[in-house]
Curated annotation (Swiss-Prot):
The keyword Cell cycle does not apply. Belongs to the TGF-beta family. SMART domains: TGFB. This is Protein 60A. Glycans are attached at N102, N114, N217, N229, N377. CDD domains: TGF_beta_BMP5_like (cd13761). Residues 293-322 are annotated as: Disordered. Residues 28-317 form a propeptide. It comes from Drosophila virilis. It is found in: Secreted. The keyword Signal applies. Keywords: Cytokine, Disulfide bond, Glycoprotein, Growth factor, Secreted, Signal. Residues 1-27 form the signal peptide. GO terms for molecular function: cytokine activity; growth factor activity.
Amino acid sequence: MTASLVVLPSLWLILIIFTAPYTHCTQSGIYIDNGKDQTVMERVLTDDDKLDVSHEILEFLGIAARPLHHKSHGLSLRKSAPKFLLDVYYRITAEEGLAIKNKSDHSRSKRDANESEQNFITDLDKRAIDESDIIMTFLNKRNHNVEEMRHEHGRRLWFDVNNIPTDNYLMMAELRIYQNSNEGKWTTTNKQFTVTVYMLRSGGSAPNMLEPLSSVNTTGDYVGWLELNVTEALHDWRVNSNENHGIYIGAHALNKPEREIKLDDIGLIHRRTKVDDENQPFMIGFFRGPELIKSTSGHSTQKRTKRSTLHQRKKSKSEPVNPFIENSIENTRSCQMQTLYIDFKDLGWHDWIIAPEGYGAFYCSGECNFPLNAHMNATNHAIVQTLVHLLEPKRVPKPCCAPTRLGALPVLYHLNDENVNLKKYRNMIVKSCGCH
């Protein structure tokens, strides 16, 4: 048997999905430990209960509304931007050592061996990944209505950045373009080129002025991703969306900067690139967000009060089903980490959360009795409190069993049909327990 739970601190509610492997039925409800190393159902949760919990957790995680239904994760993951985030996701889970269940249609820990993995996540990316809370990707909008450029050799790209939350601080933004020398005109290391990204600005007599942002050097035989810094452009677009006229990509020979060459000649941004092409150009934004786990006080109190009232009205439909449960079960085991599994699928989130399908959250449970052993990770204060409790048990309580170390949970999800986000929720997974 497997048991999975969802803990919601603001409601003090535990939702557990319990599946028997030899049957085809699944029940959702509240399960508790009966003190004899057995997990038993205390009561069944109705569909309304689960919907209530789902809304509460969305608010708890700082997601304003449930993203729209997405038909196929597999189709979207063929695109370049989601593939990048999927690699980032697996890198984070590997470093955190998370016990996470992932869907079978994308259960890979790295890109295919024939792909240029070594330059897909750079050292600069790794630092930005570690420091950021939210990573957003943006694909080029091919159908955006813009004026044609007079520069026939380069390419113009445009990204819709209107969905970025205003309270997120931009750390860095990168443009990724793929070079495939096999499709180019020059395929030798003797040919060196400079690729430059420009921000398109309007003003004056010229309809579009080119403001250089960054450049990168490459060779004619290079195959892989090129990274260009576009932080200034994304920052300006967020301040004033009317200034978002896109960017322009140009290239020239290293020894002839005055002569622009066709990007096709060095295998860059081919005109026949499809929307779902895994080498489609994309932009990455690394952000530091506010505390992602929202406070349980303030403006949301009224909403929770209404839902709690609704929960009380529905309680008659979900009364205890096990008459052998004693409400005053005392856990006599010493403080230790217990298994707790969160299942997103039972909340109906499998159509917009790409990964994970579920994760091990764990929890701390048990007594902090004298003497406090080494495995209890007791603080000095807890040791003193235990001794005082022996002398004055009615005045001073025993120390509490609580997490001593917590880990982050990465969640990869569809914002809409065009954009995929990766959020890191800190302090979501118990790593160790102790007496405090």
